[in-house]
A protein has these predicted regions:
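Short catalytic/signature loops enriched in Gly
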Residues: 4-5, 22, 233-280
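Helix-to-loop junction immediately C-terminal to a conserved catalytic motif
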Residues: 57
């Protein structure tokens, strides 16, 4: 087995101008993801998850630090067709809303065919066979291939979006709240599918979520972000059994359960924010 991580983030920092100063969105973020691994990036709105995702897929350039995919630097805002295609083959993303990656005017099969053609598969029968293979991989068939996105259920659309991302055989798949809009039973089906895919292909998954239950289900490790910083990074089982940081404990307490105390949680949240502001 290779000892080179599929994906490595080292000392990432990203700021944005705001007024006369700069807002620190991500500060000193580091992690490694190996073949077949699954890392959960956990945090609420404003934690830095979205900025991190944009850096991982090359849409933003970090102010400091670097991102390596299979040992090679990931270029941001790449110019030139060949370079853009190479970046797409390194890291793909599946969004919460599959309509962001599926053209509503084109059938699912034609969408997949177009991706394969764009990435150099000129042989039509070979593309048709690969489309069938991709659809089968995500549990879809000929009926779904012929359908427009609006003719599919939410779960089927998300499966189609996953198939589209897998078409280029990326090293890493980033899933940005990819199941949060689905019913719980459909969530479980998609999460099982993702677990099967990483086992069968060795692809690395980065699962971005505010939902610790989802992270528990599919990830090996979890990295908890708060105000742009990593506050905890552990194997999922250890993090959930014995969270070390007050924010991680607050996230766990925020999940509804018998004896749930929303007012107490809100008070703890304000106290944590005040203590962090005082520390900074």
């Amino acid at each position: 087995l290779s000892t080179t991580p599929l994906l490595q983030a080292a000392g990432l920092r990203k700021t944005y101008p705001t007024g006369g100063s700069r807002l620190v969105a991500v500060e000193d973020l580091s992690f490694s993801l190996y073949a077949g691994g699954a890392l959960g990036l956990v945090g609420e709105s404003g934690s830095g998850k979205t900025t991190t995702v944009r850096m991982l897929v090359g849409l933003e350039r970090p102010d400091q630090g670097e991102i390596l995919v299979q040992g090679a630097p990931l270029a941001a805002r790449t110019r030139g067709r060949a370079a853009r295609l190479a970046r797409a083959k390194a890291v793909q993303i599946v969004f919460q809303d599959p309509y962001l990656s599926l053209d509503g005017r084109i059938s699912i099969g034609a969408t997949l065919d177009g991706v394969l053609r764009l990435h150099g598969c000129a042989d039509r029968p070979a593309r048709a066979a690969r489309v069938r293979e991709l659809l089968a991989q995500v549990g879809l068939g000929a009926r779904e291939a012929a359908a427009l996105p609006r003719g599919l259920s939410g779960g089927q659309r998300q499966r189609a979006a996953i198939a589209r991302a897998l078409a280029v055989e990326p090293a890493v798949l980033v899933l940005d709240e990819a199941v949060s809009a689905l019913d719980v039973s459909v969530q479980a089906q998609v999460l099982n599918l993702l677990s099967d895919i990483r086992r069968d292909t060795g692809i690395g998954l980065v699962f971005v979520s505010h939902d610790l239950a989802v992270v528990r289900y599919v990830c090996d490790e979890a990295l908890v972000m708060y105000r742009g910083r990593t506050v905890e990074h552990q194997p999922v089982a250890e993090l959930l059994a014995a969270p070390q940081h007050p924010y991680t404990r607050l996230l766990l307490a925020s999940v509804p359960h018998p004896g749930w105390d929303p007012e107490g949680i809100g008070r703890r949240r304000r106290e944590l924010a005040s203590s962090q502001e005082a520390a900074s």
